[in-house]
């Protein structure tokens, strides 16, 4: 395909292994260190990219305090080969932060405000808890239900509205672990995981090149034994069908098509369209439906044109209604989250948007796909979507 000079292309993608937040591999590694390691290694494996050309490092992170505070993008950038003359900013759209980082870079490239960007995100949920320092305004309850800020209850609501059974959720949860384990065993994550030193359960330092979050022994039967996590009386959402609390980072090198051509770089993909949308916070998990429909319309496509989809698995009770209304339920085994998702790999908030987008590009490459969609719900009622075309 022919590209326009200001088209936005993805040059490379990498991520850390996903670590458990409670006593996991990253327990002695800071968020900025994790981010800097990832950026450095990704630049090292792309020698045609001069770090001095980086216009901006745009890093997603949700809880921007403690080690994640004071513009972690700049903190991490200063610890890499990127010179001090390049800029850096940290962005937050809660769960969609690093996809927003990608969109911010893309919009800059499209408008001629830079040619080379490093984007991604991090969340060390073991060091900085998701509610650390958060103080919601009590008056918000005048405008949205108080439970809208409780993500598990919004998933319960969405599941109930769409008739999603406990068994369907357990099947979806087991599928995530089984597919992630299969992808691991077959080396499907090899191109995206950048090995990192960490500590095993016995405290020994070792190099990790795999996700420690996957539980290959997970079955529908074992998940059926779990109690509801958010609504003890009559609830259906359990810890086993919710995204794991994990630590991780993801990173992409993004360029204008013209600069990639000048440097003799073959891109992974080009961005065809982007979109964000809002929904009632009480059903926050439904956000990917309007954002995906908007992005597809902007690209002149329909969901039937899409070869592969990565939908962030915040909750099975949330993902299944989204897939139903995007008319993907009957295509799930062919198109959706073929390497598992956040139920198995976890959802480090600031990391996930770039993570699912990069995984999508690898799935497209491994399976000969042309068009792909990455999409996710966002806390308090948003959706964000990117449409890619492989080149």
UniProtKB/Swiss-Prot annotation:
It is found in: Cytoplasm. Keywords: Acyltransferase, Cytoplasm, Fatty acid metabolism, Lipid degradation, Lipid metabolism, Transferase. Disulfide bonds: none annotated. It holds the Pfam family Thiolase_C. The keyword Transferase applies. GO terms for cellular component: cytoplasm. Its EC number is 2.3.1.16. Its main location: cytoplasm. GO terms for molecular function: acetyl-CoA C-acyltransferase activity. GO terms for biological process: fatty acid beta-oxidation; phenylacetate catabolic process. It catalyses: an acyl-CoA + acetyl-CoA = a 3-oxoacyl-CoA + CoA. Pathway: Lipid metabolism; fatty acid beta-oxidation. It is an enzyme of class 2 (transferase). Belongs to the thiolase-like superfamily. Thiolase family. Catalyzes the final step of fatty acid oxidation in which acetyl-CoA is released and the CoA ester of a fatty acid two carbons shorter is formed. This is 3-ketoacyl-CoA thiolase. The lineage of its organism: Bacteria, Pseudomonadati, Pseudomonadota, Gammaproteobacteria, Pseudomonadales.
């Amino acid at each position: 395909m022919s590209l326009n000079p200001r088209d936005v292309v993805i040059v490379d993608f990498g991520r850390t292994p996903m670590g458990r937040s409670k006593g996991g591999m990253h327990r002695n590694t800071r968020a900025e260190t994790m981010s800097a390691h990832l950026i450095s290694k990704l630049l090292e494996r792309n020698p045609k990219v001069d770090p001095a050309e980086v216009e901006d490092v745009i890093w997603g992170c949700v809880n921007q305090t403690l080690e994640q505070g004071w513009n972690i993008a700049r903190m991490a950038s200063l610890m890499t080969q990127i010179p001090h003359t390049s800029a850096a900013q940290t962005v937050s759209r809660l769960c969609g932060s690093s996809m927003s980082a990608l969109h911010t870079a893309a919009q800059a490239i499209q408008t001629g405000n830079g040619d080379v960007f490093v984007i991604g995100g991090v969340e060390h949920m073991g060091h900085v808890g998701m509610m650390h320092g958060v103080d919601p305004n009590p008056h918000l309850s005048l405008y949205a239900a108080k439970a809208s800020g409780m993500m598990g209850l919004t998933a319960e609501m969405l599941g109930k509205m769409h008739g999603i059974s406990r068994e369907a959720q357990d099947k979806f949860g087991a599928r995530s672990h089984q597919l992630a384990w299969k992808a691991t065993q077959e080396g499907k994550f090899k191109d995206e995981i950048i090995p990192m030193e960490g500590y095993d359960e016995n405290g020994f330092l070792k190099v990790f090149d795999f996700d420690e979050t996957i539980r290959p022994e997970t079955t529908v039967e074992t998940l059926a034994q779990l109690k509801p996590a958010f609504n003890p009386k009559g609830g259906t959402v359990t810890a086993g069908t919710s995204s794991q609390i994990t630590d991780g980072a993801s990173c992409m090198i993004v360029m204008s098509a013209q600069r990639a051509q000048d440097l003799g770089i073959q891109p992974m993909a080009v961005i065809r369209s982007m979109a964000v949308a809002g929904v009632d916070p009480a059903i926050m998990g439904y956000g990917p439906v309007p954002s995906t429909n908007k992005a597809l319309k902007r690209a002149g496509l329909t969901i039937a044109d899409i070869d592969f989809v990565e939908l962030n698995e915040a909750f099975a009770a949330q993902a299944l209604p989204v897939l139903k209304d995007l008319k993907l339920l009957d295509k799930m085994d062919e198109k959706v989250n073929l390497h598992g998702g956040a139920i198995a790999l976890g959802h480090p908030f600031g990391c996930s948007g770039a993570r699912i987008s990069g995984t999508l590009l690898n799935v497209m490459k491994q399976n000969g796909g042309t068009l792909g969609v990455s999409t996710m719900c966002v806390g308090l009622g948003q959706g964000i979507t990117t449409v890619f075309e492989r080149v």
